[in-house]
């Protein structure tokens, strides 16, 4: 039987494991941590947090793939009464509706935007500087970057367009992303995949067939001894907060003065926190010279405006900095094709959200994982033809 080793048991690693196992491959997954999921882990109670604000977009190929296999978990529905509590922060105040120019800019597709020009310059030429700033700030929800306007116009526009489309693409697994990971892991085991947790791999295994490295780029660079495995990513403060419930709190605050996003996840999924409490997760991008305190102060200013008495209502909070863990960002003149290649040669393949694969957020991990399995099995067995029509 064909053999494949996968290092990393996050969303990308499990996607690769399932794809290979469906093709009749003997798969072993090594996960260094005690639990699977990587950045898709959900904390155990009482506060079932993800690693920062997370959503599962329905417009990418991963959605169809998961749905066809019955792997999509139950999804949390947002009540209409909560949906109308979406707020934007603009010119120092909270408002119910974003400026019309944001929607006009967001309607443009990624293909209309240039690769070689930064987003701010391109959008300013079309809609004026004010709209360009607002649109760049809003796109931060899918970028986790402090200055989206400096990035490639096509890269930013794709995310802006996807993040604002109607009906919304963003969906929320009930109970957190960990529910999706658990379903994927269960199916993988049913297909015969051997999953070894607390199994740290410090050197590439030899003689066991192709190897797929499904780790963050810094870990992959150390494992492969290749310092060139780098690509720019965001740097953001993650701010988690549990409050005693108060009727009328916003569902979302999107900062249009500077990239920042606060979301009350219990609005659609009360199971994420104990009864009588609300769980908020926020991300506040910070520049290379800014500190965690700067991001926390940003969050607190927004909370002061939107969540009256939040300090007195706080029952739990947590803050951290996420650096290089939020997916690739592309500078002007570059696209996803310029990122580290999936095929590293000699039967080694690299997958994840920082590699050369298309898509938004988790879609990059998915697409690279399917591509890596296709390449690995094609190279390992020239006569083998992997049917990826369902992927």
Each language-model region and where it sits:
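Rossmann-like flavin
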Residues: 82, 88-94, 98-161, 166-172
